[in-house]
Amino acid sequence: MLLVLAIKTLVLGLCMLPISAAALGVGILFAGYNIAVSRNPDEAETIFNGTLMGFALVETFVFMSFFFGVIVYFI
């Protein structure tokens, strides 16, 4: 029983790794937004809409990974 709990804890820890990758991805995404707006300020609204869609996609994968880890840990 202790081995199963240890494996579940490791799986939960491994499912937290995409959170750090998502933080890096969001930073790169908004850095690209800043560069794009500085080069073409007239298209700032269009670029921002695409940036928000990318942000939502990244966060979706983070939440899926987190909930998968929680489900594995508690079931």
UniProtKB/Swiss-Prot annotation:
GO terms for cellular component: mitochondrial membrane; proton-transporting ATP synthase complex; proton-transporting two-sector ATPase complex, proton-transporting domain. It is a multi-pass membrane protein. GO terms for molecular function: lipid binding; proton transmembrane transporter activity. It holds the Pfam family ATP-synt_C. Keywords: CF(0), Hydrogen ion transport, Ion transport, Lipid-binding, Membrane, Mitochondrion, Transmembrane, Transmembrane helix, Transport. Its main location: mitochondrion. F-type ATPases have 2 components, CF(1) - the catalytic core - and CF(0) - the membrane proton channel. CF(1) has five subunits: alpha(3), beta(3), gamma(1), delta(1), epsilon(1). CF(0) has three main subunits: a, b and c. This is ATP synthase subunit 9, mitochondrial. It comes from Paramecium tetraurelia. The lineage of its organism: Eukaryota, Sar, Alveolata, Ciliophora, Intramacronucleata.
